[in-house]
Amino acid sequence: MEPLDTLNLWMERARDRARAISFGRFLWHRFLDDRLFQAAAALAYTTVFALVPLAIVVFGVLSAFPVFDRWSDQLSDYVFSNFVPNAARAAEGYLRQFSASAGQLTAAGFIALVVSLLITLNSVEETFNQIWRVGSTRPKLTRFLVYWTVLTLGAMLAAASLAVSARVFAMPLFGTQEGRWLAELALRLAPILIEFVCITLMFRVVPHHTVKWRHAVPGAILAAVILELVKWGIGAYLGSFQSYQKLYGTVAFVPILLLWIYLCWVAVLLGASLSSSMAAFRYQPVELRLPQGYEFYGLLRLLGRFHHARAKGKGLADDEILRLEPMLTDSLLQDLACNLQEIGLLRRDERGEWLLSRDLDQVSLADLYECTQLRIPVAEQHLPYRDDSLGRAALAALDDLRLPLRERLKRKVSDIYTDSGDMP
């Protein structure tokens, strides 16, 4: 889908008042469920311990390639000049000193630094998986390869972009007045564009979930805007409140850096929550909503879809499942899929599609009941799609469970104690 088509689609949906209100409520509940501010605090804490290992890895990668080594100082200066408050610039010197002393580390010290970096990256992935409601994680080796690729390629691409930019801005075109104005505009917009691109790629790569561009881009825009507002707010506050330097002295950069890291994670996680909400939101008219307590009916329909897909030799992606079964929400689908994965009934392939990994004749209703812990509904409710072939089959199986139970539940509680005799 083209970006313009996506924009028109969302504008059309925004004009639907019921849909807009429903999405607003859904987004608010997702914000609360994700506990973003607590997650940002945890990530900020682990990030502080990973700053030195991260600097060692980045500068170590650049120094390994002579063509990039001479750009490491410019890269460090550019990052701290454009993405970190001026009050925290002192951290740059300390990180450079620690990186220069990395060669004096013992094997145990180097391993400890690498472990702290991997813990931080693993925490980021776990937080993103939680936001996207992903119950499974990548294999450990795959995770390590992804982390290492992001760190090494990210450092080299950043240095390469600086080298290309310097070569481009040295062209005669930028020696004219119009060229200088264009160069100044590009330099002003570059930090925002870099933030936007990095966050978009983060949303696409980090979660163990297929995130579409049309969902990642709006979340990245929100995160980049919040980051710019945070930078402006911190600069305005510190510019009007100078006593913090007298209070903290030479370590004044420490609380500023901690606050900045925390607010950066808040911005990124808010954008991630918006992206996941846009992907998960399904507007359901009242007549198509699955009644509360009838999730078992949805489970039986879901397994029917997998049974038919397996007969055709294919799997089902999340989007296709939600299209086939619009009564299911994304959260319910992820919960059911994770429960079925735990008992080895489902597995996810390398393309992110779900596949049946066992024959259904090897699975009983008791197995489904035990692994999902879903209730067996008793009351009568209008069920969506009950008249199609899949609905009739699922409802018949559900009636075999609930109708005898309904008769049993008509028993009076007092009958339980009629023949119990005297209490001890």
Curated annotation (Swiss-Prot):
It is a multi-pass membrane protein. GO terms for cellular component: plasma membrane. Keywords: Cell inner membrane, Cell membrane, Membrane, Transmembrane, Transmembrane helix. The chain crosses the membrane at residues 48-68, 101-121, 144-164, 181-201, 216-236, 251-271. It holds the Pfam family Virul_fac_BrkB. It is found in: Cell inner membrane. InterPro entries: UPF0761_bac, Virul_fac_BrkB. Signal peptide: none annotated. Belongs to the UPF0761 family. This is UPF0761 membrane protein Smlt0865. It comes from Stenotrophomonas maltophilia (strain K279a).
